[in-house]
């Protein structure tokens, strides 16, 4: 088979994969309805890719925030929902409208009593490629993720007010 590198980044709060990584077949779904329709028999032991496309028409109509909200639900709740059906990891198509090979990440959630599985954001371009390949044949991926949560520490924000020479009384 062909080997293709995929651009992804761990979701905020994700657990790591085992040190040696994990390999699994990818199941591509658009939304929670498609995931649940596959049930445990279609999901158990697999890596789920939520390939929900950002709604550009909604964004162009002035509802970009709502379009983003529809996309990020899979980032936040995807791992816990897929884990309930036995998934071993979850990938989420980048939530924004950018069409590039940069993975857009954010926070994910876990639920009490549900097995924690690794979660990562995958770039728009790679999500499209995986979905296209999965229509023709099984796609397997090896994930090696090393995120960690460190103890809280005190931190600071630096804020400065610099007076300009042309309009010193205005804030830019």
Which functions belong to the PLM regions below?
Residues 1-60:
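Noncatalytic luminal/extracellular "stalk/propeptide" segments of secretory-pathway proteins
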